[in-house]
């Protein structure tokens, strides 16, 4: 809705703008396709560029310079120097292969921390995601034995290994029924993963 705001003097049906959206592939796999479909249905002449959130994308500077229109992501503490809109919250769960021992017998905190985890590659050296930030706040650390920069590939890696992916339920549920994976509750309570849109 922010992209189509009348306050910007914008007529969707005739506009020929290019919308540049910074986003990661860790969103629900249907979120960005639905966003693109909505933009194309309301503004058919507009172009859309999805830019990956990475160390190479200084989203604050690019938002300020008008090089990116909106950034979509999840932050434990979103930046307070930008406009912010909450999109949705999601329960934190773990995705495991259907033959993972925890799928049969469950796990306690110690077993969950010790098992082999897979996580996205940090966007820059020293960066941590919301999962590890929360664990740090509890004085805990999980055993990350694999990292991948392409979040969309991780569920297939989980399906063929004993690796555990911990992220939002909506993301995980998209793969149940398509891959031999199942969703398990985390033995540690996490706050909901909040997804935001940011703009200048």
Protein language model regions, located:
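Short beta-strand->loop
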Residues: 83-93, 165, 169-173, 177-192
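Central regulatory/effector-binding core of bacterial HTH transcription factors
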Residues: 15-79, 148
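A late-sequence structural motif
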Residues: 31, 103-104, 109-110, 182-200
């Amino acid at each position: 809705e922010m992209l189509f705001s009348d306050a910007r003097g914008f007529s969707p049906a005739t506009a020929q703008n290019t919308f540049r959206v910074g986003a990661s592939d860790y969103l629900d796999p249907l979120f960005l396709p639905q966003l693109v479909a909505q933009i194309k249905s309301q503004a058919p002449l507009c172009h859309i560029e999805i830019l990956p959130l990475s160390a190479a994308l200084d989203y604050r500077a690019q938002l300020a310079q008008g090089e990116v229109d909106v950034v979509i992501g999840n932050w434990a503490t979103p930046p307070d120097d930008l406009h912010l809109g909450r999109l949705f919250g999601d329960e934190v769960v773990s995705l495991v292969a259907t033959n993972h021992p925890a799928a049969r017998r469950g796990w306690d905190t110690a077993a969950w921390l010790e098992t082999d985890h897979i996580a996205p590659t940090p966007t820059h050296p020293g960066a941590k995601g919301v999962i590890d930030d929360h664990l740090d706040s509890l004085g805990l650390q999980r055993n990350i034995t694999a990292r991948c920069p392409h979040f969309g590939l991780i569920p297939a890696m989980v399906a063929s290994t004993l690796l555990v992916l911990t992220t939002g339920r909506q993301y995980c549920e998209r793969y149940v029924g398509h891959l031999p994976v199942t969703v398990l509750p985390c033995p540690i309570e996490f706050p909901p993963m909040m997804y935001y849109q940011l703009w200048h």
